[in-house]
Amino acid sequence: MNTQATPSPQFYLTAPATCPYLPNQMERKVFTHLVGPRAPEMNDLLTQGGFRRSQNIAYRPACETCRACVSVRILTEQFQPTKSMRRVLAANSDVVATVHAAEPSTEQFALFRRYLDHRHQSGGMSDMSALDYAIMVEDTHVNTRIIEYRVREPGSGIDSSKRGELLAVALSDVMSDGLSMVYSFFNPELEKRSLGTFMIIDHITRTRALGLPHVYLGYWVDGSEKMGYKTRYHPQEHLTPRGWEIYSPKEE
């Protein structure tokens, strides 16, 4: 009987580039392509090993002099929202979340551009076009979903034909042990809603309902103010050289 071996993934190392998170640092990444029938399995294994997905690429930092980027995952079963998080849930009690296939829309892109123009006027994503956005959403060989968050239309009930204002969008991968939040964005003018926090709590709730243990948030960068929000959700684990370990915040 002839058997054809599945080729092992090939890994590559990027050239040094300026770090987008910390001053006076250079970054390098190791990456591989997520394609073919084994892509979902590989995405699971690599994410559990500290990689992140971007389109059909899985990557992780491989910096020569810095180890500030740390993979973070929330333990969904033990998670309890804080008082401020409960206020966020109350402020968004009029929001309805709907799960869709990984397909872009002009409405999503318009919100995406508003978010970038307000929050990320510089950086690698600042000049993304509608085509770039479509590629970001569609170029996936794993189980990826789009979650749209909208204001509930008065009297709409379960009638999905009545759609309220689009407030936020999350691009997420469904994995064997949880959900991985690949990218999310929201209306930056609605600060009082704290939509970023709301989406993370919603993912925790969804993951728990699936009976799965983890929500992956990507990298927390110690010393980067814009990444600080990722350590607010407890309990959570950080990937260390010894494996995944419970994170204990430093005493102020």
From Swiss-Prot:
A GO MF term: arginyl-tRNA--protein transferase activity
Database matches in Pfam families: ATE_C (PF04377), ATE_N (PF04376)
Subcellular location field: Cytoplasm
Record has Acyltransferase as a keyword: yes
Catalytic activity, reaction form: N-terminal L-glutamyl-[protein] + L-leucyl-tRNA(Leu) = N-terminal L-leucyl-L-glutamyl-[protein] + tRNA(Leu) + H(+); N-terminal L-aspartyl-[protein] + L-leucyl-tRNA(Leu) = N-terminal L-leucyl-L-aspartyl-[protein] + tRNA(Leu) + H(+)
Keywords: Acyltransferase, Cytoplasm, Transferase
GO cellular component: cytoplasm
GO BP terms in the entry: ubiquitin-dependent protein catabolic process via the N-end rule pathway
Major localisation: cytoplasm
Coiled-coil ranges (or none): none
InterPro entries registered for this protein in UniProt: Acyl_CoA_acyltransferase (IPR016181), Asp_Glu_LeuTrfase (IPR017138), N-end_Aminoacyl_Trfase (IPR030700), N-end_Aminoacyl_Trfase_C (IPR007472), N-end_Aminoacyl_Trfase_N (IPR007471)
Keyword check for Metal-binding: no
EC number: 2.3.2.29
Role: Functions in the N-end rule pathway of protein degradation where it conjugates Leu from its aminoacyl-tRNA to the N-termini of proteins containing an N-terminal aspartate or glutamate.
Cited NCBIfam families: PRK01305.1-3, PRK01305.1-4, PRK01305.2-3
Similarity remark: Belongs to the R-transferase family. Bpt subfamily.
Name the record gives this protein: Aspartate/glutamate leucyltransferase
Organism: Agrobacterium fabrum (strain C58 / ATCC 33970)
